[in-house]
Amino acid sequence: MLNSLDLEGRPQDTRIVVAMSGGVDSSTTAALLKSEGYDVVGITLQLYDHGAAIHRKGACCAGQDIHDARAVADRIGIPHYVLDYESRFQESVIDSFAASYATGETPVPCIECNRSIKFRDLLSTARELGASALATGHYVSSRRLADGSRALVCASDADRDQSYFLFATTRDQLDYLRFPLGDMTKPQTRELARKFGLSVADKHDSQDICFVPTGRYTDVVGRLKPNAMEPGEIVDLDGRVLGKHQGIVHFTVGQRRGLGIASTAPLYVLRLEPSTRRVVVGPREALRMDRIVLRDVNWIGDSSLDRAVGDGLELFVRVRSTRRPQPAWLRAQDGGYQVELVAGEDGVSPGQACVFYDAPAGQARVLGGGFIKSATPRAAGKSALRGAPASRPQVADARG
């Protein structure tokens, strides 16, 4: 007989490790599972030097968060452990974040953290503790398939859905993970937290990248990759120099204000060229991209990726965490994979994720995804656009 987590055995005989960040979502997850009788163990990861982030609203994984997680564990009566993952986090997430920015990409550190820290290292720790599953407070769901494996699906609350950040989850990891909040709304979660008497019931949501509590990611990039702060030229699509800048890291795709150049028509940042330290600007229509070349593709759909793609697979993709999935085609191309967007997208950026879905709305199944290597217009009007990687938008919402 299966319990509420779709696992064999009675809840009291089933150990569940909960990843507790100190926020209301993971805290409610732990309290909910404890109330259902599970043998719950809470684990909080210390990921970075958190002193500067203490007590700051909108920052996660900070010193105050560790205190809050411990207080919740004491309240609901579960063991709680803090694991020092600072060196792993520095190498796997922070260093790669800075390196990605220095090459003109816009990384999504939450994806890398989930992939290499939470769902690899922490999951291994949970298994070592004899847990039957690792539960998190993500707003996403999973369901059992006919063969016993699990599918990743969007949360019922589309405005809270975090599936974009979890596309890199492997099949093996997905079978071990559980997401108890997948069918809840945020207000319902907070109401449960109040019911359980949790001190974090009204705690602010995390909004910044956790290791950038000030919101100024350029401080991190500048410290680790000073070359990203070197001055360069601002040029138009024909290569004409329009002005100077003080580092490509200060610019984002679609940016119009603060360019420091005069023009009779509106100009937008189109892309960054780190090798020449150039910022390329142009008209708004030049922002639209239609073809995306992917790297590091992860497939969690049925069968193998190559068999599923065949001569072309019609699906839906999301190239920003805040956008709804849009129609696209996934094709094999030159030993890799390429996505063709039916309607196109403004500001597609290398380093961001392109996530695959089987439907445009509702609790769609996540089929996988990849990181964007480059993007081009379907029919570039300027030779300067052909084959050139697109530039980057604002850092994606880091909640997750």
Swiss-Prot record:
Disulfide pairings: 113-210
Keyword terms of this UniProt record: ATP-binding, Cytoplasm, Disulfide bond, Nucleotide-binding, RNA-binding, Transferase, tRNA processing, tRNA-binding
Localisation: Cytoplasm
Cross-referenced InterPro entries: MnmA-like (IPR004506), MnmA-like_C (IPR046885), MnmA-like_central (IPR046884), MnmA-like_central_sf (IPR023382), Rossmann-like_a/b/a_fold (IPR014729)
Reactions it catalyzes: S-sulfanyl-L-cysteinyl-[protein] + uridine(34) in tRNA + AH2 + ATP = 2-thiouridine(34) in tRNA + L-cysteinyl-[protein] + A + AMP + diphosphate + H(+)
Chief location of this protein within or outside the cell: cytoplasm
The keyword S-adenosyl-L-methionine appears for this protein: no
GO cellular component: cytoplasm
Active site positions, chain numbering: 113 (nucleophile), 210 (cysteine persulfide intermediate)
Chain sites annotated for binding ATP: 19-26, 45, 137
Gene Ontology terms, MF aspect: ATP binding; tRNA binding; tRNA-uridine 2-sulfurtransferase activity
GO biological process, one term: tRNA wobble position uridine thiolation
EC number of the protein: 2.8.1.13
PANTHER family, A to Z: MITOCHONDRIAL TRNA-SPECIFIC 2-THIOURIDYLASE 1, TRNA 5-METHYLAMINOMETHYL-2-THIOURIDYLATE -METHYLTRANSFERASE
Name of the protein in question: tRNA-specific 2-thiouridylase MnmA
Organism: Rhodopseudomonas palustris (strain BisB18)
Lineage: Bacteria, Pseudomonadati, Pseudomonadota, Alphaproteobacteria, Hyphomicrobiales
Gene name of the record: mnmA
